[in-house]
């Protein structure tokens, strides 16, 4: 009996003292913006956050540490109405921890270039995805650009978005309308996205709207993946994309505007001012302000010819 009690006490002691974060805890993150120490514990003093003591979510970040570009508090400030009662995402579906976890599957996302490039990429990513999921309006509390990440699924009465394909066959009864931060749509996007992230999205497309990490992964996959003749959004915002002669003739130049062209240029670009483009820019400027970085040049696409039909459905 004594041996049994001793073993039980030992188990309880070990479980109570188990590490909280980082490599010692399967990559878990600290809550409330705390730093993860090199030993796997959460805190906010020098023992946790200081140079040589911090392994993740460190002040100022480190190469490869997305937490140094966007903190939990910044995330909440940017998407401060995502849990409004009128939003599908209420209940913290779009959480900071889910975003950080998903981003870890895409080396280079938010970690490429100097701190200016990294901040611009995060601002641009959240601006474009906020436009796709916005629940805001002109006179909304805190302004129209505080309502990103409100919706999980395409609004209205969307169709099945099934294009006959041998490579990406539609599953019986499944619909491939817009879901998640980037509102990924069509079987020919769900198929390769699912293959890339290791999930069968052709048979289970609604995972993009029910699993937070998969939802973020779908958006980051689109962001990081070039689809010829389009470059990836990532390569554009980090300065890796160099316009070809064809691009230059079409006025497609590096900047936030060409990312809008990649996403929905067939509908929004090449015809002067467009309210949807301005909405994207409004989000981008706000997020750049929160992250403390200038937005750069060439923000709109009014004089750019489109790459072709957009791969996504515009939900606004």
UniProtKB/Swiss-Prot annotation:
Superkingdom of source: Eukaryota
InterPro entries: Chitin-bd_1, Chitin-binding_1_CS, Endochitinase-like_sf, Glyco_hydro_19, Glyco_hydro_19_cat, Lysozyme-like_dom_sf
Enzyme Commission number: 3.2.1.14
Gene3D superfamilies noted in UniProt: 1.10.530.10, Endochitinase, domain 2 (3.30.20.10), Endochitinase-like (3.30.60.10)
Keyword Chloroplast: no
Chief localisation class: other
Induction text: In response to infection, elicitor, ethylene, wounding.
Annotated keywords: Carbohydrate metabolism, Chitin degradation, Chitin-binding, Disulfide bond, Glycosidase, Hydrolase, Plant defense, Polysaccharide degradation, Signal, Vacuole
Annotated signal peptide: 1-18
Coiled-coil regions, chain positions: none
Disulfide bonding pattern of the chain: 21-36, 30-42, 35-49, 54-58, 87-150, 162-170, 269-301
Intracellular or extracellular location(s): Vacuole
One function term, GO molecular function aspect: endochitinase activity
Gene Ontology terms: biological process: cell wall macromolecule catabolic process; chitin catabolic process; defense response; polysaccharide catabolic process
Function summary: Defense against chitin-containing fungal pathogens.
Protein name: Endochitinase 2
Source organism per UniProt: Solanum tuberosum (Potato)
Gene that this sequence comes from: CHTB2
């Amino acid at each position: 009996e004594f041996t049994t009690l001793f073993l039980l006490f030992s188990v309880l002691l070990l479980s109570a003292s188990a590490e909280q974060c980082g490599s010692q805890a399967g990559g878990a993150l600290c809550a409330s913006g705390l730093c993860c120490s090199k030993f796997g514990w959460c805190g906010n003093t020098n023992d946790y956050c200081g140079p040589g003591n911090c392994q993740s979510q460190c002040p100022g970040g480190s190469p490869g540490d997305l937490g140094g570009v966007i903190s939990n508090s910044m995330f909440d400030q940017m998407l401060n109405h995502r849990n409004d009662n009128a939003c599908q995402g209420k209940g913290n579906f779009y959480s900071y921890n889910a975003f950080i976890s998903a981003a870890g599957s895409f080396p280079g996302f938010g970690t490429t270039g100097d701190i200016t490039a990294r901040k611009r990429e995060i601002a641009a990513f959240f601006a474009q995805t906020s436009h796709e999921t916005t629940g805001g309006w002109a006179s909304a509390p805190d302004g129209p650009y505080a309502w990103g990440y409100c919706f999980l699924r395409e609004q209205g009465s969307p169709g099945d978005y099934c294009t006959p394909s041998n490579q990406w066959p539609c599953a019986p009864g499944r619909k491939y309308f817009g879901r998640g931060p980037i509102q990924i749509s069509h079987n020919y996007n769900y198929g390769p996205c699912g293959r890339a992230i290791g999930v069968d999205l052709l048979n289970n497309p609604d995972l993009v709207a029910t699993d937070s990490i998969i939802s973020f992964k779908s958006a980051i996959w689109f962001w990081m993946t070039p689809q010829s003749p389009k470059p990836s959004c990532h390569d554009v915002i980090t300065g890796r994309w160099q316009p070809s002669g064809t691009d230059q003739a079409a006025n497609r130049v590096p900047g936030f505007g060409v990312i809008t062209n990649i996403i929905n240029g067939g509908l929004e670009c090449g015809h002067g001012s467009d309210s949807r483009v301005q909405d994207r820019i409004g989000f981008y400027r706000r997020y750049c302000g929160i992250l403390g970085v200038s937005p750069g040049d060439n923000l709109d696409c009014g004089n750019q010819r489109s790459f072709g039909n957009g791969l996504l459905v515009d939900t606004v």
